[in-house]
Amino acid sequence: MRVAALVLTCAIALAPRAAFAENFKPFTLKTLEGDERSLPQVLGGKATLVAFFFPTCQYCNAAFPLVQKIYDANKDRGLAMVWINVIPDEQRLIADWRTSHGYTATILLGSRSVAEDYDLRMTPTHVLLDGKGKVLWKHAGYKPGDEKEIDRRIQQALSKE
């Protein structure tokens, strides 16, 4: 499984590059519970932080506790959050992973093609959208301190909503 994750990460990094469009590409993906969600349903007219991840990603596991705190502090102000898994082989790990960490984000089940569709270079990749699906900001990877920029961008987006 880790080999598959490494291969996918390398394949994503080496794939031809196509920039994020001004508007986020529409999608319909399944939740862990098996329900389908489209981009408009996910947005619900709110600023939304989308994160592409997989459960054994060490950088995701470093970032997400901090991102969860940012979400908790801003959800009552209108922030939505959704995480999209990009490694199908790890889908069976997600429910226990989410529960053990206390994460509350809506989690959608993506695929390698989803990673390619959105030109992902690494995980986590965070994309901040306005309520209409316009890309306000994108950030790939995580290093300590990045959460401050994520929070700053969210505050900017919420002040415009």
Indicate residue ranges for each PLM-predicted region.
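Short, internal strand/loop/helix patches
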Residues: W97-K132
